[in-house]
Swiss-Prot record:
Disulfide bonds: none annotated. This is Uncharacterized RING finger protein 332L. The lineage of its organism: Viruses, Varidnaviria, Bamfordvirae, Nucleocytoviricota, Megaviricetes. It comes from the Viruses. Coiled coil: none annotated. Belongs to the IIV-6 175R/332L family. GO terms for molecular function: zinc ion binding. Residues 65-89 are annotated as: Disordered. InterPro entries: Znf_RING (IPR001841), Znf_RING/FYVE/PHD (IPR013083).
């Protein structure tokens, strides 16, 4: 439907706006939004862009393409090489991680591996301008957090290596005595063991309890009175 200038002069602004939208016109002169244009300028722009019969088909196609580009920019789209609109990708999907050293490698300590991840993280944040969780390396933040919580800084590692040992190292005699103190009778769980069962070689009971049992508590082997030998542990 063709609209003359006189016809559009009699229309309300809302009706003119609907006409412009139907022709995909959202901006007027100098990319000014149609909602902010004066009515007379609004009518002139619509009349020149769409309703003038002198426009050739190529001119009309150009007008529609410009309108499509305006709509695309408004929706965050961009024109592609084939003329169609494509949504802009805010992340670079062609990321290739060429090398990340293994934390178990002999050439890289866990601390240097952590520093490498930090440097890579910083460079990637600059390249993408967004959080890592939205990109292909979404787990990198998790790895860095784990390393930060379990690894020591260089200064802390140096202090730990240079810290003097203030404890005591037990001797063999002390360890043996402590072991004897903890070996208790398997029957009463109170007295120290002091009886050797000669056949099975088990030392597992105290003197009073060995008189009341007829088999070894460990291997269940029959123990005669002649097989019970009292020993004295140091």
């Amino acid at each position: 439907m063709e609209y003359t200038r006189e016809t559009m002069q009699k229309m309300r602004r809302e009706e003119l706006k609907n006409i412009a939208i139907s022709y995909r016109i959202y901006n007027g002169y100098h990319e000014r939004p149609i909602s902010k244009m004066r009515k007379s300028d609004f009518i002139d722009f619509i009349h020149e862009s769409v309703t003038t019969p002198n426009h050739s088909p190529n001119t009309r196609e150009t007008i529609l393409q410009n309108a499509n580009r305006q709509e695309g920019r408004r929706r965050g789209l961009r024109p592609s090489s084939d003329g169609n609109l494509r949504r802009e990708n805010r992340h670079n999907e062609d990321v290739i991680v060429h090398f990340i050293p293994s934390p178990l490698s002999s050439r890289h300590s866990p601390i240097s591996f952590r520093d490498t991840l930090r440097d890579f993280d910083a460079r990637r944040r600059i390249d993408f301008g967004s959080s890592l969780m939205g990109g292909p390396l979404g787990l990198l933040d998790v790895v860095i957090n784990v390393l930060n919580s379990t690894s020591l800084d260089d200064e802390e590692q140096h202090e730990l290596n240079n810290e003097e040992f203030t404890g005591t190292i037990p001797t063999e005699v002390e360890e043996e005595n402590e072991a004897h103190e903890t070996v208790r009778c398997a029957v009463c769980l109170h007295n120290k063991v002091c009886v050797l069962f000669q056949k099975c070689k088990h030392v597992i009971t105290c003197g009073p309890c060995s008189l009341r049992i007829k088999e070894c508590p460990v291997c269940k082997r029959i123990v005669e009175s002649s097989d019970k030998i009292r020993i004295f542990l140091p």
